[in-house]
Structure formats: C-alpha cells, structure tokens
From Swiss-Prot:
Keywords tagged on the record: Hydrolase, Protease, Serine protease
PANTHER family: PROLYL ENDOPEPTIDASE
Catalytic activity: Hydrolysis of Pro-|-Xaa >> Ala-|-Xaa in oligopeptides
Source species: Aeromonas hydrophila
Function comment: Cleaves peptide bonds on the C-terminal side of prolyl residues within peptides that are up to approximately 30 amino acids long. Has an absolute requirement for an X-Pro bond in the trans configuration immediately preceding the Pro-Y scissible bond.
Protein's recorded name: Prolyl endopeptidase
Entry's transmembrane regions: none
A GO MF term: serine-type endopeptidase activity
Length: 690
C-alpha cells in the first residue's frame, strides 16, 4: 500500500482557457502554470515540493540509499588527455566535486588546475559547457551554463597567467566555439527573446565572429542577415589548417544545409555543399582542398564521402567509406580516420587512411561503447574510453601507426564487473519488429518474477542508447534491482529507417515497443507488474507519460524526468519548434492534430482511472523542455486520478534539463527516485543490503 490517503495536494486553480484546433475546442485549465516566474506559479512550486518532500521523508531507507550513493560516487575520476599549445589537458574530479576540474600539465612537471567551475558558484550550479583553444594554445575560450539554463556566457582566459580577458559574451545558446587562428572565433547567438528567456520561443540563430580585444557589439555578423539565411540552428567549423569555414544551418533536429568558404582567398564566395534539408551532412576532416563528409544522403546508415572544396555539391561526392548494414560514425586524429560501426547498439571500430584504405580493426576490450579516437592530425597517440553497463569507463592509449593498445587508466570505481551480468535479448513488438533489450543485474539473482525492475527508454531524435556505466544504476543493481534498457524505434541504433519508424504518425510504434519490452520482462521471469517501474527523461519522459496513460495496468511505478507532455503546445516554447521533424505539430494538419492529441500525455489523463504511483521530476531553469509540461501534467493527474497511488512532482531549483547538474543534486535525485520506486513497490526495507 502506498500512502496516498495521507496526501493533501495543493489546490491548483483551474481557468476557463479554451484553444481551438480545426474546429475542435481543447481545454487548457492550467495554462497559467506556463508563466514560470509569476508569484502564483512560484507559490505552487513551493507547495508541491513540500508535499513531495514530506512524502519522501517517511520512507525508512531513503537516507541509506543516499548514503550508499554518496559513498560509491566518491572516487577519483580522470578523463583522456588532449594537447593544446605547450600543455596536455585533462578533466578530473576528486570524487564528490559538483563539477569536473580542468587541469593542465607541461612535460616533466606536475599538473596544475586551470579552471575550477566549483569556485564559480557556492551551490555548484555553474557548469563548464564547452572550451576551445586558439591555434597557438595561448588563449582559452570557454562557455558557462548558469543554473542549468541553455543560455551561455563565453569567457576568455590567458593561458599563461590564467587571468580573464575581456567582458564575457552574452546571449549565447546552442553554440560551438570555433577559432580562426589566434585572432578570434565564430559563435552562434539568438536575439534576446521577448518575455522570459526560460520559456519564450527562440527561432532565428545567427553566426558571429568575435575578434579578440573588441566588444561584443562590434562582432561581425557572418550568417543570418538575409531571409534566405533564417534558420533555427546555425553552427560553424573551421578546419584544423584554418583554410576553410564550414557553416551548417538547420530548422529541426534532422537535415541541414552546409556551406563552405575558402578563408585563404579574400572575397571568396560561400559555396553550397548541400542546399536542401533532405539529409544530414557534416565535416569530419580535410586534407588540403579535399573535404571528408559524413552523410546519410542516399545512405540511411551513413557513408563517408570526399569532395573538392571548390566544387562541393552532392553530384560531386565520391564514396570513401560506403554505406554498410551498420550505422556509421567517423572520427579523425593521428593522420587517420576511424569508422565506428554500431552493431546491435554496441561498437566496432575500423581504422582507415585518407585514401580509404582499411588499415585494421581496432581490438576493443569487449561489447560496449567507445568514446574518443579524436585528435590533431599530428598526434602520435590517441585515447579512447570503453564502458558498458557493468564495466566502469576505462581509458586506453592507441598508437595509430602501429595499432598498439595499452591501458592508460583503469577506473577507480568501487564496482567489480565480474559481480554483474549484462545480457542482450531481443523481443518482438506489437507489429512483429525485432527490438533489442539489454538487461543488467547482479550475479546470483533469481529470475523468479519477484525482482524490482526499472525499464528505461528514449526512442527519438536518432539518439542511440548504447551501453554506458552509471554509478546510480550500479547502485540499483546492488540493491537487488534489475535495470533494462530498450533500444526503441525512433532512436538511431539501426539508422535512418529505424529513426523514421518512430517519428510523427509512426510515434505509436515507440510506445508499442516499450510496452512489449515490459511484457517480455514479465514473461521471462525478471519481474511482475507490481515490481515494475518505467523511467525516461525528456523525449523519454514523453514515452513514460504516453505508456502510463495508455496502459496504467502495465506497471506499478512511473518516473518521468523533464518530459515533453503537452504535445499540442510544445512547439510554442523555447527550442520546441525544432522538434517538429520528429513529432509534427498541432498546426500542421487536422490529421496531425488528431494524432498528437491522441497520445499527448497531458490530454490522455482520464478522470476515474487508477494510475500507477508517479513521480514527475523537472527543474525550474529547464529552458529546453520547459517545466510547464510537468507542472500541467502533475496538476491534471492529481485532479483526475481515482486510484490509491501518489501522484507527486519533484521540482529541482537552480537546475536545468540535466547537463551540468551538480553531483550533490544528482545523488539526491537518484536517492529520491530509488526510494520512491521501492517504497511504492511495497518494500519497507531494502530488498538487498548493499
């Protein structure tokens, strides 16, 4: 039994707001919660948090879970080194530092701290986002996120003195930092929106060049000045030899235009590499005037093509690494190209030279995910990380000329891979589609149908859920839990066709895949209904919301984080319009409106239905998926749910969509989610003492 009988939800005012779509009236009684800075909304947030925290405080093992998380998180972590100027840099964390620290090291000397974001805010909510060095390595440009917002400030630092240079650049969002020599860099910015920066829509991205020693007001507008250059996302890349500028322009999360300009020729025109939005194309490398491009144009699983920069149109592209059955990603460094193939959501890596000759397959330690294989063209060694759900990240050194691999740094995580099982299974979805599912648990676990199980999914935006280690998940396994990750349609695990099969009017496939995964886990003896929780964040929060409203009988607990839950209005907030490629919008057509309304979690809550125990989590500074989605959904659940289970919302303050969240907040969030999950499954003591 849960404790809903003891819950008294805050009163949430209902308005008479009605919207009309193609002659249909749709009520939106909690529209006022979209004003995230109004005193009424702020009071509502405080009241909801009080109810949630009071409920969580009664759980007898909540503190034990938090203590175990803090203990197991407290180990030294160090990232792969990279070379800039005279220094080798790396990120490190002593254990429980809220943000990773940038360190630099000269040959033969001890490492020193270059940039410590933990000193920038007392609560650790100022996070380092991107960093980029001038070609000579003497100047560092880095962007900071404040309280989790997508808006950034770009700061400049003199490397030798570690002193700041200039006034920070403001109003930066969804931007890279791409240097041109040592004189300045390209970055992207939106005009300051009308209304709240945290909820107002941002549409036109512009590319600027900032020259060192000048004010931001003097920055040169490079792209975005004319109507033909109006795009929602604009970014720049300068080739390592400073010869070419490439500009990518897109209106959604799939498909982009690409342009190239020869920076060595004064007055050189901006040439079109790809002039439509029919496919994705991006620069991997260049060798002289030859560009190396990764694209899914005429290749759903992607291919690597080459083209001369002075005649770069698609009709001139030539395959260097042709499309295969597996999805391709390409990295460059050390004078070589590295083709990473995804085989049933796990990585294989092959090395090629710039003429397309296959040099070797890189021997990986096992089945899992890799990161790295990036560097400068003259780097004598590259580094890569390897991990899976049972294996903490381990760093390896790779010598591209010989192919030699050596252990660079083993993980200090207090977990032994041999204590866990991580197995891949395949199941059939509603329409017969074969879907992969990776299931992890501690060795010795009895598959008798009684295990507390979390099923996690995402299923969107061409994002692939590859095996990765998480201290939080490892703790769940140590508590006696099962953790299952479904590689749903809508993701990128099997290329463009897999992605498109979970978009727009195919979105129901994603929900059906997830429902089938839950049924598989129960049929195979991993768990049962009252021991099953479903979980997802962002687009995965939409997934959880849709599945719990379509099949409230399927699971006992639903935990959704920063979810997209109002499918009729998502495109009117901040970056939401950029997701239309995956979702479609309620303004597209009557058929699209009907389809969206049919699964929109906010509009699918039905009065008189008993819903599972639900914990909605969001953050007050989330300007990617604005918290109004979660606010309105939680208010609707609290008003309409007829069952005995709690419908709670946990609202993090001074936090955003997730990236850069301080370690202290991550520990608290994980502890609350696990405590709630186990308590609502009926546990009054931990299923396994860690």
């Amino acid at each position: 039994m849960s404790g809903k009988a003891r819950l008294h939800y805050p009163v949430t005012r209902q308005s008479e707001q009605l919207d009309h779509y193609f002659g249909q009236a749709v009520a939106d009684p909690y529209r006022w919660l979209e004003d995230d800075r109004s005193p009424e909304t702020e009071a509502w947030v405080k009241a909801q948090n009080r109810v949630t925290q009071d409920y969580l405080a009664q759980i007898p093992f909540r503190d034990a879970i938090k203590g175990k998380l803090a203990t197991s998180w407290n180990y030294a972590k160090e990232g792969a080194p990279f070379r800039e100027g005279r220094y080798h840099y790396f990120f490190k964390n002593d254990g429980l530092q809220n943000q990773n620290v940038l360190c630099g090291q000269l040959a033969g000397k001890p490492a020193e701290v270059f940039l410590d974001p933990n000193l920038l805010s007392p609560d650790g909510t100022t996070a380092l986002d991107q960093l980029s060095f001038s070609r000579d390595g003497k100047t560092l440009a880095y962007s900071l996120s404040l309280a989790g917002s997508d808006w950034r400030e770009i700061h400049l630092m003199d490397v030798e003195s570690k002193q700041p240079l200039e006034t920070p650049l403001r109003d930066v969002k969804f931007s890279g930092i791409s240097w041109l020599g040592n004189e300045g860099f390209f970055y992207s910015s939106y005009d300051k929106p009308d209304g709240s920066e945290l909820s107002a829509r941002t549409d036109q991205h512009k590319l600027y060049f900032h020259r060192l020693g000048t004010a931001q007001e003097e920055d040169r507008l490079v792209f975005g000045a004319i109507p033909a250059q109006r795009h929602r996302y604009v970014g720049a890349t300068v080739t390592e030899d400073d010869r070419y500028l490439l500009i990518s322009a897109a209106d959604s999360t799939s498909g982009n235009r690409l342009y190239v300009k020869d920076l060595t020729r004064e007055g050189a025109p901006l040439l079109t590499v790809q002039g439509d939005l029919a496919a994705d194309v991006s620069l991997v490398d260049n060798k002289g005037s030859r560009l190396y491009l990764l694209t899914n144009r005429d290749a759903p699983n992607r291919r690597l093509v080459t083209v001369e920069a002075d005649n770069p149109g698609p009709e001139q592209w030539r395959d260097l690494i042709p499309e295969r059955q597996q999805v391709l990603t390409v990295h460059s460094g050390g004078g070589y190209l590295f083709a990473e193939y995804m085989v049933d959501a796990t990585a294989r890596v092959e090395q090629f030279d710039h003429d397309g000759k296959r040099v070797r397959e890189v021997g990986l330690p096992g089945l899992g995910s890799v990161s790295g294989f990036n560097g400068k063209q003259d780097d004598p060694a590259l580094y890569f990380g390897f991990e899976n759900y049972a294996q903490p990240p381990t760093l390896y050194k790779f010598e591209p000329n010989s192919g030699a691999i050596s252990l660079y740094r083993a993980s200090a995580a207090p977990f032994k891979p041999e204590d866990y099982v991580s197995e891949q299974r395949f199941y059939r979805s509603k329409d017969g589609t074969r879907v992969p599912l990776i299931i992890s648990y501690r060795k010795g676990l009895k598959l008798d149908g009684s295990n507390p199980t979390i099923l996690y999914g995402y299923g969107g935006f061409d994002v692939s859920l590859t095996p990765s280690f998480s201290v939080s998940v490892a703790n769940w396994l140590d508590l006696g839990g099962v953790y299952a990750v479904a590689n749903l349609r809508g993701g990128g695990e099997y290329g463009q066709a897999w992605h498109l099969a979970g978009t727009r009017m195919n979105k129901q496939n994603v929900f059906d895949d997830f429902i089938a995964a839950a049924e598989y886990l129960k049929a195979e003896g991993y768990t049962r209904t009252d021991r099953l929780a479903i979980r997802g964040g962002s687009n995965g929060g939409l997934l959880v919301g849709a599945v719990m409203t379509q099949r409230p009988d399927l699971m006992r607990v639903a935990c959704q984080a920063v979810g997209v839950l109002d499918m009729l209005r998502y495109h009117t907030f901040t970056a939401g319009a950029g997701w239309a490629y995956d979702y479609g919008t309620s303004a597209d057509s009557e058929a699209m409106f009907d389809y969206l309304k049919g699964y929109s979690p906010l509009h699918s809550v039905r009065a008189g239905v008993s819903y599972p125990s639900t914990l909605v989590t969001t953050a007050d500074h989330d300007d990617r998926v604005v918290p109004a989605h979660s606010f309105k959904f939680a208010a609707t659940l609290q008003a309409d749910d007829a069952g005995p289970h709690p419908q709670l919302i946990r609202i993090e303050t001074n936090a955003g969509h997730g990236a850069g969240t301080p370690v202290a907040k991550l520990i608290e969030q994980s502890a609350d989610i696990y405590a709630f999950t186990l308590f609502e499954m009926g546990y009054r003591q931990l299923p396994r003492q860690p």
